[in-house]
Amino acid sequence: MRANKKSFQEERHIRFKELTMRETIGFIGAGNMGKAMIEGICQNHVFNTVWVCDHHQENLDVLHEKYGVKTSLSEIEVAQNSDVLVLSVKPKHYPKLIETIKDSVKSDVIIVDIAAGVTILDVKTYFGKNIKVIKAMPNTPALVLSAMSAISFDDLVTEEDKACVQSIFNSFGKCEVVEETMMDAVTSVSGSSPAYVFMFIEAMAD
């Protein structure tokens, strides 16, 4: 059984690597959702290199020890090294963060926005230039690698870029492509429904 499991993991690794030529993903912010995404990506070897920036050194130490990721306290260093850059911070921090990194990102970088209420247009406006942006909303079951994520693409994103990002979100659950106009509704339903299910289970247990 152990050999079969290893074979399955190897097949997943091959399949993910066939989806993208991008080698490095970076995370700015390593809260619960960021950690869940990092775990799925590292377990499935979606990228050769994972960079993580966080203001709490203890978070970085844990992630480095557990997954071997590269860590930094500098947002700029992570931005400079990332082919795909996930902005995993609270919505209120987006303007200041992007102002810090906007001149440091690679020209063909894919920005992944996972902040509720921050649109693709908002991100482009903060960067002050036309840049590839993907809006994504994972939900809390990501913490047990069972997320149901919604993703939306801007017009600059290629088919290869789409496959790359879908491989990210499929690594810790499943994902569906939706129009960005539907993202608020998706957030309300998929973001809140797990909490209701947990309440049902707790009530039944009582």
Task: Label each residue range with its predicted role.
Residues 67, 75-80, 84-87, 91-151:
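Rossmann-like NAD(P)(H) cofactor-binding subdomain of soluble oxidoreductases
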Residues 5-20:
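Short, Lys/Arg-enriched N-terminal segments with co-localized hydrophobic residues
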Residues 122-132, 148-185, 196-206:
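Internal alpha-helical scaffold of NAD(P)-dependent oxidoreductase catalytic cores
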Residues 20-71, 77, 146-147:
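NAD(P)+-binding Rossmann beta1-loop-alpha1 motif at the extreme N-terminus of oxidoreductases
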Residues 193:
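Aromatic-residue-lined binding/catalytic grooves and analogous aromatic/hydrophobic interfacial grooves
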Residues 189:
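Catalytic, metal-anchored helix/loop core of enzyme active sites in primary metabolism
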